[in-house]
Design a protein with these regions (language model features):
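Intrinsically disordered, low-complexity regulatory regions of eukaryotic proteins
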Residues: 1-126
Length: 126
């Protein structure tokens, strides 16, 4: 009988996780959030990540935008940060701050931290 290795894509090894697996655990790949959690926390983390779809999508979209388009008008189009202000119109705490309107990486990191908070892996700063 020939051993066939299961082909794993780039998804997180945690069952049902919507994130990409970017950290090796010695054979399987997990996302940064499951890497921070103990295995008994994985179902709760997965559920929180799935529930935060708008934040996950926003992170992916922010990563695709160049720094110039993010912070200033280009060819008559408004700065891209305005799209995210509108996306989170009902959640002003998730809109870009004044500093993040200039530095998109700061905004991306804050959204990533928001996912960690929602997954119970980080605490909100007061």
């Amino acid at each position: 009988m020939k051993y066939e290795e299961k082909e794993q894509g780039h998804e997180c090894f945690a069952n049902g996780c919507p994130m990409a697996g970017g950290i090796s655990t010695g054979g399987n790949w997990v996302c940064a959030y499951h890497n921070q959690a103990t295995s008994d926390q994985w179902p709760r983390v997965t559920e929180a990540l799935r529930d935060a779809e708008a934040v996950r999508v926003a992170i992916n979209e922010v990563m695709k935008i160049d720094m110039i388009s993010w912070g200033s008008a280009v060819n008559g189009y408004p700065p891209k940060w305005q799209e995210f202000a509108a996306l989170f119109d009902d959640y002003p705490e998730l809109q870009p701050t004044e500093h993040e309107k200039i530095r998109k990486t700061k905004y991306e990191y804050r959204l990533r931290n928001e996912l960690a908070i929602r997954a119970g892996l980080a605490k909100r700063k007061l």
